[in-house]
Amino acid sequence: MERHDIAYELAIPGAQELLTSASMTRLAYLGPDGTPRVIPIGFYWTGDQVVVSTAATAPKVAALQARSDVALTIDAGETPDQARSVSIRGRASVEIVDGVPEEYLAAARKIMDAGAMAQFEQACREMYDQMARIAITPSWVRYFDFGAGRLPRFLQDLAGQGQR
């Protein structure tokens, strides 16, 4: 996918809303044995990258260092007319950092009040001497809004056939 196409998809207001306000993504990657994994994980959107963080010793760190291609989805909506999703494919770069990455704390701030956040940050700083900062750079992006008719192409094609 071309950079301008990626930028276009990411700039759609609904995509921006999901990227900046949702607290969870589902990250897909290949495990060390070559089988797929999908995990829910908190994230932070920097404007250019999706950043997730975890313990430096987490199994996903070694798996992503070995195979950096990933996919993720950020979604919302409980009914078909409310269903929205940003699907991203890209490469993950893993950096082991001292302490707690700021993006990890920023992701938590989206869902915690000030008191809970202070306790969470203190607990994290006590627990983690190091963390893995995993930055995912999009190489393909699609925003879907089922209620607004922004559907995957195959569904658009099926819907078009039904209207003939």
Model regions and ranges:
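Structured helix-beta-strand junction loops
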Residues: S21-A22, A66-R67, Q130
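Short beta-strand segments
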Residues: S23-A56, L64, A71-D75, R84-S87
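Charged, gly/pro-rich active-site loop segments
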Residues: M1-L10, D81-R164
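Short, basic/aromatic recognition patches
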Residues: E2-R26
